[in-house]
């Protein structure tokens, strides 16, 4: 992907405006999950090492544009950075008409979503952001699918617009998995509905050698194969779509499943053959035989793309399928990339974070990239790089 990279630029004495993803959960003024901040710190340190005058900003929550709201302030992020960095970090609320930045400090510009015109990519706001800097650095993959003033507009008007290390790594990893994957390539697509992942499935059917489906998506494929799914979550109207996909792509249907009588943490799990599901039962996980068969497919894969669990792994009784699949991915020698909220929760639960080749930081952006869509914030960086 031809974008200018921050790592290749001389930033000495330059005013650098970094758009990061610091949209972290906050409770009682304290950051409760610091993953996104920790991911951004190396970018900030690199900019400082290169002698830049560093500004960084992000969105946080959903404030009303034009109104400052303490609940959506980046102050907890500033407090976190001050506690974890050896350089002074200060928060500036009013910065659109200019801000003084010194070398050796980090200036955090208050939540971009407080600025009128941010979401609709108002060109005047984009120009104001651009006037603050010599170099704009887009480093928030999680918002790259949105054309907003701080992700797109500023990149149009800044003297130089480039990709930060996080964004560049994300694009490289996704490119490696989707553009020229080492084969065989296996995709794991879980989730409750075929309809929400239809474009993902269609796109992957043209790339992957095999697609493993899980969750409610798998139930629709089980029904398409002619089996009773009882009270399971599935989409009857999408059975023809599932049949077409199964006819053109290798999509293994589970041979056994775990069922329950109610959707609850305490529901008892019964393992049975896929053709023995009763009318009052719901499928909540794949069975051991299916999990082992799929683990074998994963073991032989050279590229693995993972988006979504294969069962209701939040409930201990219906966790085993996702656990077996997760460990198979972790133990595979192939290149693995994982993305999506539920997938990240499974990675944390099973303690396999260090064994996945690349974990994507973007939910919606990850899916849109997999669907083959152009991400606006990346598109504008490419345009700027190519004059």
UniProtKB/Swiss-Prot annotation:
Subunit comment for this entry?
A: Monomer.
Q: So where does substrate get bound?
A: 21-23, 36, 59-62, 113, 146
Instruction: Report whether Transferase shows up as a keyword of the record.
Output: yes
Residues that coordinate or bind ATP: 197, 314, 340-343
Q: Which InterPro entries match?
A: Phosphoglycerate_kinase, Phosphoglycerate_kinase_CS, Phosphoglycerate_kinase_N, Phosphoglycerate_kinase_sf
Its protein name is Phosphoglycerate kinase
Q: Which UniProt keywords apply?
A: ATP-binding, Cytoplasm, Glycolysis, Kinase, Nucleotide-binding, Transferase
**Native organism:** Pasteurella multocida (strain Pm70)
Localization in the cell? Cytoplasm
The encoding gene is pgk
Q: Which Gene Ontology cellular component annotation is one that this UniProt entry carries?
A: cytosol
Catalysis: reaction(s):
(2R)-3-phosphoglycerate + ATP = (2R)-3-phospho-glyceroyl phosphate + ADP
Q: In which pathway does it act?
A: Carbohydrate degradation; glycolysis; pyruvate from D-glyceraldehyde 3-phosphate: step 2/5
């Amino acid at each position: 992907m031809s974008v200018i990279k921050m790592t290749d630029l001389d930033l000495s004495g330059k005013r650098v405006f970094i758009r990061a993803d610091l949209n972290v959960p906050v409770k009682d003024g304290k950051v409760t999950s610091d993953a996104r901040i920790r991911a951004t710190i190396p970018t900030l340190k690199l900019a400082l090492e290169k002698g830049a005058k560093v500004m960084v900003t992000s969105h946080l929550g959903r404030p009303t544009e034009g109104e400052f709201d303490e609940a959506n302030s980046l102050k907890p992020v500033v407090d976190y950075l001050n506690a974890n960095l050896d350089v002074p970090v200060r928060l500036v609320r009013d910065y659109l008409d200019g801000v003084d930045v010194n070398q050796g400090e980090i200036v955090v510009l208050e939540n971009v979503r407080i600025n009128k015109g941010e979401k609709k990519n108002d060109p005047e706001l984009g120009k104001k952001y651009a006037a603050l800097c010599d170099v704009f650095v887009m480093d928030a993959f999680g918002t790259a699918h949105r054309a907003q003033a701080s992700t797109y507009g500023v990149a149009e008007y800044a003297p130089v617009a480039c990709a930060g290390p996080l964004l560049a790594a994300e694009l490289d990893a996704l490119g490696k998995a989707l553009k020229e994957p080492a084969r065989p390539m296996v995709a794991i697509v879980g989730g409750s509905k075929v309809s929400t992942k239809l474009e993902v499935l269609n796109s992957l059917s043209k790339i992957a050698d095999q697609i493993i489906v899980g969750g409610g998506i798998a139930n629709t494929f089980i029904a398409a194969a002619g089996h009773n799914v009882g009270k399971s979550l599935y989409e009857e109207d999408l059975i023809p779509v599932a049949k077409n996909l199964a006819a053109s792509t290798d999509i293994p249907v589970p041979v056994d499943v775990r069922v329950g009588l109610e959707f609850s943490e305490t529901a008892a799990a019964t393992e049975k053959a896929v053709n023995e599901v009763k009318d009052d039962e719901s499928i909540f996980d794949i069975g051991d035989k299916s999990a082992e068969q799929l683990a074998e497919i994963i073991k032989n894969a050279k590229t693995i793309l993972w988006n979504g669990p294969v069962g209701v792994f939040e409930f201990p009784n219906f966790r085993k399928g996702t656990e077996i699949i997760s460990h198979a991915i972790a133990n595979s020698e192939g290149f693995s990339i994982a993305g999506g909220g539920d997938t990240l929760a499974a990675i944390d639960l099973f303690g396999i974070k260090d064994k996945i080749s690349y974990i994507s930081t973007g939910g919606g952006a990850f899916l849109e990239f997999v669907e083959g869509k152009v991400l606006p914030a990346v598109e504008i960086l490419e345009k700027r790089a190519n004059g």
